[in-house]
Amino acid sequence: MAKIAKTHEDIEAQIREIQGKKAALDEAQGVGLDSTGYYDQEIYGGSDSRFAGYVTSIAATELEDDDDDYSSSTSLLGQKKPGYHAPVALLNDIPQSTEQYDPFAEHRPPKIADREDEYKKHRRTMIISPERLDPFADGGKTPDPKMNARTYMDVMREQHLTKEEREIRQQLAEKAKAGELKVVNGAAASQPPSKRKRRWDQTADQTPGATPKKLSSWDQAETPGHTPSLRWDETPGRAKGSETPGATPGSKIWDPTPSHTPAGAATPGRGDTPGHATPGHGGATSSARKNRWDETPKTERDTPGHGSGWAETPRTDRGGDSIGETPTPGASKRKSRWDETPASQMGGSTPVLTPGKTPIGTPAMNMATPTPGHIMSMTPEQLQAWRWEREIDERNRPLSDEELDAMFPEGYKVLPPPAGYVPIRTPARKLTATPTPLGGMTGFHMQTEDRTMKSVNDQPSGNLPFLKPDDIQYFDKLLVDVDESTLSPEEQKERKIMKLLLKIKNGTPPMRKAALRQITDKAREFGAGPLFNQILPLLMSPTLEDQERHLLVKVIDRILYKLDDLVRPYVHKILVVIEPLLIDEDYYARVEGREIISNLAKAAGLATMISTMRPDIDNMDEYVRNTTARAFAVVASALGIPSLLPFLKAVCKSKKSWQARHTGIKIVQQIAILMGCAILPHLRSLVEIIEHGLVDEQQKVRTISALAIAALAEAATPYGIESFDSVLKPLWKGIRQHRGKGLAAFLKAIGYLIPLMDAEYANYYTREVMLILIREFQSPDEEMKKIVLKVVKQCCGTDGVEANYIKTEILPPFFKHFWQHRMALDRRNYRQLVDTTVELANKVGAAEIISRIVDDLKDEAEQYRKMVMETIEKIMGNLGAADIDHKLEEQLIDGILYAFQEQTTEDSVMLNGFGTVVNALGKRVKPYLPQICGTVLWRLNNKSAKVRQQAADLISRTAVVMKTCQEEKLMGHLGVVLYEYLGEEYPEVLGSILGALKAIVNVIGMHKMTPPIKDLLPRLTPILKNRHEKVQENCIDLVGRIADRGAEYVSAREWMRICFELLELLKAHKKAIRRATVNTFGYIAKAIGPHDVLATLLNNLKVQERQNRVCTTVAIAIVAETCSPFTVLPALMNEYRVPELNVQNGVLKSLSFLFEYIGEMGKDYIYAVTPLLEDALMDRDLVHRQTASAVVQHMSLGVYGFGCEDSLNHLLNYVWPNVFETSPHVIQAVMGALEGLRVAIGPCRMLQYCLQGLFHPARKVRDVYWKIYNSIYIGSQDALIAHYPRIYNDDKNTYIRYELDYIL
């Protein structure tokens, strides 16, 4: 009970408490005085709103939203008929897709841009620079100054300017941060703002046309009022003017959102807009920037002027310039995207708009006079609305004087408007509509459906592939049908290249192949400029896919060979696009990038490559420096390290910029990574170039120098310690002085150098460096941990380090700081820790390490248990279980059983670990086998498929150990259990069960197997129909093993049934399955005789599928090899009589494989098959001749030295006429046959055939004969000497070599 209040204060407090409790009551439980009443909502379905049940909004379309009409309601008032559907619980179980779900998303080829991180996205900000001057063109003549080509000097100046600007901005930012920036009221601020002039106010000398002569960029920089920001607006490192053709010059990717900027308004922090410094505005100061939200709102139909009043004469453009300004060529017009129609098209342009540009809704309707192209692209509703509006405008237009005179009686006159009168022009009164007649009809208009949109052509005409929406901006010219004969040669060339590129990018393989060959052959005719100007922007496309990039890179690779030195002016352009490939995560992309840069270096030469890439070496942007360093490494590998050494020496010792030194040293590091042991001849020179970097004043330079030393030492392993003598001292000092990243790099270098040293030195250095390593064990930095682990591994792996030292000094802190849960979460740390621990175990023994981590097999974190298991598996795989005592053995078995049972993820780590440990322990496992088998049997009954699969897999891993422990009874029991589980419905589990049965059959033998083989095999026959690869592979292996070792346990009828099932397995995608299948045919034929099996196989030659026929021919050859060829050849040769192409080719293919397999046994059958081969070598069908040539090749190689030369010479006469075939497959087979015949009948006879055509008048004949002669020469050079024709001496020359005739 509450305490009774006695004093006045207590009473007041109690009252306040009661009032507070009342206020806290839920207001929903009561009814307010002025509120509506509430019904029982369970019965009547009440609502808080008085408007419930009313339609609160009208749909935009005139169709009512019917969803509400069928919503189920349980109220008595206004009860609707309930709909019938599935129970709510069932519906909730079905995952509902979101509105934006794309069912095809996972099947679409991924775009490169989707997988790029922030750093790699940098490549899209790079600008494809304009062509540069080729100093070697025209024999090195002085270039014509009128060409305006950018020279090396221009690029370096721009680089210098960019760098200065960056530094100034940095200083300003620092001053602003420190509060030292002051507003200076100078002379410029006191000048009155320039008055805006209308164009009517201009005097004669201010005519816009009288633009003074264009100044050079350096003169402009000194002109008052002109801020030299022309080049500072660029992305660092890439010069201006390199924009994609058609892009607005001067608009950069980092520019602010375009907005309406009146004249004189400066972009903050940028000075005047580049290119807009017009004469007459020199001393004007910039007015405050105008906010677009402060302006008078305008619709699209307003006067498209320049921020001026309503009464101005409309102008054609919408730039932000004042009317008085002269638009400087090349200057960017700052436009507002809000006051433009989506596709502003000039009236005279071709009336086809690319998709995505169609004006929709208001913009299209608000156009004053749409051009024919715009009319074409309007929707029918827009066109109808526009026609009505035009008719109303036509009726409400101002009346002309003639019309007024006709309407009014005489006596009226027109009064002049009062002075200063400005007519009111509101957006609603569309008085600025241009009265351009379009020949339309007024009056009643029949509303017919407008089909113009349906015929808009968004695909190129002619035999061109499908154009994706993303490609339209690059290939839009192909959408316009033009008469190509009317175009200029340059335009024709451009269209031709565009067509070829579209075929390569989007075409079918045959189309792509032809286009690639054509663009390669005509590369010099097209020229480097037109080709690269179209290919490179495509490669920069943000929607590019891997396959498309691969194809375009292949185009560049091919045309580089053809263009050769013509490529020099475009080297930088190509590098900007290709360099990002060097840091791509895809290995093949990196290889392609290296290949292109390598070919480019060979085509352009060292001087061009250095002069092109030199400005990028000290670029302010780290991304550019990184990619440039990698590219230089590729150039070094292509042109040789010695040619680049003088340049590298100069760069690495640059005093002007630390960026240059940093990049130079990085180039050395990348050369070492790329070229590996190929740096050994130049190792001392490379070390000398970068050694001073270890004591540089810049931290980043010191770090990269240490990393470069580490890379060089890694590449040179195990040689070259003498070359590193000069850097040992600074490295040693460095590891004592540095902390953080710098220390990590120095430790890495020491770590790679210690394995190169002699044993006594390695021991001394390891002891010294270990003090620092042990200190850094507790570092929280992930990168430092990885390096410390790596260095510990390297130090402990050297010969001079003793096991006792490692046990006492290293192991305690190592396990304390590294064997933690957090290390198992990061994959790179996980891998490094396992490797280092295994290396320590190699020194100190398995028991020492395993005893420290065995208890962690029962840890609660699965990832940590996996790390422990993997470490134990590797240690025991390397060192065995000899030094593991009985107690540790028990702990180990107990731990791995626990870890195996507790695993939740499907991973092979636990399985591999279990198998390795059990196999390493061998007979010592016998006491634990009942426990292991009990666990396995119990888990085979588990409802989870993954658990059952792991249990079956474990049986296959431990079967060998069970045999070693003589537990055949246990294995027989397991075999019966597995046999009962052959009805398993999950294919992954069934595959594992078959694998376990196979393992048991292998070790227990056929006669002891339970269940018996005669029961097991019929159970396997239907499983062969299963299409799952794992099931197929394990099942065919098991059947093959039984056919090989226990065929007598099964009836011939069952084997024939299996033969028919095996034919289906020949269609399998996996080669291992097909190989096992054809081998099984051989085993079965050996068991039941070849005739029935052969009949089955010969029938299979009639099928259409090529893969099936080829596998069948291989099976026939294997049957022939197994059961002797005479059992197969009669039937095979008889089958050749069937007048069907596939069958005849199959027979020839079988003969080819047959003679390949039987080798020298072929000597007995060569005369039998010669008539068949004669017929095949004279057949009209190319494939017959090709396959018959292959038969001749294998046959002649098999019978070499067995006296069959007469038959082979006969066949040579049939093979020889085919040497002039053009099909690459046929000519390859024919050349193979000739090679085989060279071996079998000797090079002399081949030379005699060859000599007749070596000097033939026709070049095509000579080419073929010389090709054959070259192959004979390569194969039997010495044997030919005795057989060259004797050429007698003439008056001038002595051809006979008499010494060859000497006979002793």
Swiss-Prot record:
> What result follows from mutating T278A?
No effect on interaction with PPP1R8
Task: Spell out the residues of the site Interaction with RNA.
Answer: P469, Y587, C1035, Y1049, L1141
Region annotation (Interaction with SF3B14) ranges: 529-568
Query: Which ranges does the UniProt record give for the HEAT repeats?
Result: 529-568, 569-603, 604-641, 643-677, 680-718, 763-801, 843-881, 1010-1048, 1052-1090, 1122-1160, 1163-1201
Residue ranges under compositional bias (Basic and acidic residues)?
Answer: 104-119, 231-241, 291-304
The protein's name: Splicing factor 3B subunit 1
Say where the cross-link Glycyl lysine isopeptide (Lys-Gly) (interchain with G-Cter in SUMO1) occurs: K413
What is the organism field in this record?
Homo sapiens (Human)
Q: Its family?
A: Belongs to the SF3B1 family.
UniProt modification remark: Phosphorylated. Phosphorylation occurs concomitantly with the splicing catalytic steps. Phosphorylation on Thr-244, Thr-248 and Thr-313 by cyclin-dependent kinases promotes interaction with PPP1R8 during mitosis.
Task: Please name the GO terms of the biological process aspect recorded for this protein, alphabetically.
Answer: chromatin remodeling; mRNA splicing, via spliceosome; positive regulation of transcription by RNA polymerase I; positive regulation of transcription by RNA polymerase II; positive regulation of transcription by RNA polymerase III; RNA splicing; RNA splicing, via transesterification reactions; spliceosomal complex assembly
The positions annotated as site (Interaction with PHF5A) read E592
- Impact reported for T261A: Slight inhibition of interaction with PPP1R8
- Chain segments carrying region Interaction with PHF5A: 547-550, 1156-1157
Lineage, broadest ranks? Eukaryota, Metazoa, Chordata, Craniata, Vertebrata
Q: Where is this region: U2AF homology region?
A: 190-342
Subunit comment: Component of the 17S U2 SnRNP complex, a ribonucleoprotein complex that contains small nuclear RNA (snRNA) U2 and a number of specific proteins. Part of the SF3B subcomplex of the 17S U2 SnRNP complex. SF3B associates with the splicing subcomplex SF3A and a 12S RNA unit to form the U2 small nuclear ribonucleoproteins complex (U2 snRNP). Within the SF3B complex, interacts directly (via HEAT domain) with SF3B3, SF3B5, SF3B6 and (via HEAT domain) with PHF5A. The SF3B subcomplex interacts with U2AF2. Identified in the spliceosome C complex.
Region (Disordered) spans which residues?
Answer: 100-119, 124-148, 173-360
The cross-references to InterPro entries, in alphabetical order and at most eight, read: ARM-like (IPR011989), ARM-type_fold (IPR016024), PP2A/SF3B1-like_HEAT (IPR054573), SF3b_su1 (IPR015016), SF3b_su1-like (IPR038737)
Where in this protein does the record say N6-acetyllysine is found? Answer: K141, K214, K554, K562
